[in-house]
């Protein structure tokens, strides 16, 4: 069915196709049965939470938490919804989502379009969970005090989420990445940490970082008591691309991001000295790529664009491949493979 659906979905506008996919997953989540088995070798504990497996859905796929159960049914060990802002916002003008099919990539300039925290949180609270639920929060584009928006989002999401992610990595909200350095970063992390209560707090940062910025983020996150770093998001860089849409503005995700994302994972592993769990995201579309990131230091991995090209069977395939690869290398548990190269 997935191979039949893809040509139909690829024949229409990317954002319309995404909306239809969310509708289908939302419906299937209410009646469907899980597609993927959960090998007993794959649980991973991060920040006191035991994830059934290390594979998570990255934020951006289910912005408003409409298909949480459906995504869990595909086999994900974690589903991260959002980015959610305190107030609803429309985001940037359409078209704003572009497939780069020859490159197995996507460019987006969505701009934190979402229905707001108040609409999404009741759905998140009611959703059936078979793994860890992350809620990714951000600031409204026109907020007078963006740090206050994060503070509000963390406080609102913390009682419902298994973990909350502060997203300061998006390139599509002007000035947002300025929160990744200097006094603004220190203030943001301190206020967010005070607002989260006992709920684990993750920080999502961009892959477009210089060495000094990486060191600064690592020090600030450790000092503030952040529980994990998600490295990273889409990139504003443009490696060699062959698609007609390659010149569109926005953040690039998918296969061309893999090299940069893997390097940033190694950079943050060095900068944190192993003091913080790392979540790898960017260009992960196979069990081999997920396993390579885990061996390079990631406790968890996430994907989104991989689903666009790999379809709904991809999470289950990655889970099976992880189990095979770790056993091939003599590991009894996937946790034993973390950071072994």
Question: Can you describe what each PLM-predicted range is?
Answer:
Residues 1-133, 141:
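N-terminal capping/small domains of soluble enzymes
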Residues 1-35, 96-122, 252-277, 285-341:
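Alpha/beta catalytic cores of nucleotide-metabolism and tRNA/nucleoside-modifying enzymes
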Residues 22, 26-29, 33-37, 170-184, ...:
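Glycine/Thr-rich beta-alpha phosphate-binding loop at enzyme active sites
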Residues 49-56, 129-137, 195-209, 268-280:
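Short beta-strand/loop segments at the ligand-binding rim of alpha/beta enzyme cores
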Residues 60-62, 84, 138-142, 169-171, ...:
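Active-site beta-loop-alpha junctions enriched in small/polar residues
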Residues 64-73, 151, 209-223, 270-274, ...:
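Catalytic cores of alpha/beta
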Residues 75-89, 168-170, 227-238, 290-317:
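Glycine-rich phosphate-binding active-site loops on the catalytic face of alpha/beta enzymes
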Residues 87-96, 117-119, 125-126, 172-198, ...:
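Active-site-adjacent beta->alpha loops and helix N-cap segments on the catalytic face
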């Amino acid at each position: 069915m997935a191979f039949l659906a893809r040509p139909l979905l690829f024949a229409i506008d990317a954002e319309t196709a995404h909306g239809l996919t969310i509708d289908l997953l939302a419906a299937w989540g209410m009646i469907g049965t899980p597609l993927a088995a959960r090998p007993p070798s794959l649980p991973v504990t991060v920040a006191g939470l035991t994830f059934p497996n290390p594979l998570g859905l990255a934020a951006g796929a289910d912005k408003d938490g409409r298909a949480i159960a459906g995504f869990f049914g595909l086999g994900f060990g974690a589903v991260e919804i959002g980015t959610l802002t305190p107030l609803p916002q429309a985001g940037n003008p359409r078209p704003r989502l572009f497939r780069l099919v020859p490159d197995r990539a996507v460019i987006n300039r969505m701009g934190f379009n979402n229905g707001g925290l108040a609409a999404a949180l009741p759905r998140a609270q009611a959703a059936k969970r078979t793994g860890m639920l992350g809620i990714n929060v951000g600031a409204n584009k026109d907020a007078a005090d963006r740090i206050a928006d994060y503070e509000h989002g963390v406080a609102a999401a913390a009682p419902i989420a298994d973990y909350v992610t502060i997203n300061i990595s998006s390139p599509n909200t002007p000035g947002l990445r300025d929160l990744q350095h200097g006094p603004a970063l220190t203030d943001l992390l301190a206020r967010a940490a005070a607002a989260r209560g006992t709920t684990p707090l993750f920080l999502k940062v961009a892959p477009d970082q210089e060495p000094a910025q990486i060191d600064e983020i690592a020090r600030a996150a450790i000092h503030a008591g952040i529980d994990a770093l998600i490295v990273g998001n889409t990139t504003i860089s443009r490696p060699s691309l062959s698609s007609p849409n390659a010149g569109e503005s926005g953040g690039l995700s998918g296969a061309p991001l893999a090299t940069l994302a893997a390097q940033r994972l190694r950079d943050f592993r060095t900068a944190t000295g192993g003091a913080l769990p790392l979540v790898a995201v960017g260009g992960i579309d196979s069990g081999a790529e997920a396993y390579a990131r885990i061996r390079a230091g990631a406790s968890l991995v996430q994907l989104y664009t991989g689903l666009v090209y790999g379809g709904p069977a991809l999470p289950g395939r990655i889970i099976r491949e992880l189990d095979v690869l770790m056993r091939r290398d003599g590991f009894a548990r996937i946790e034993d493979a973390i950071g072994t190269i």
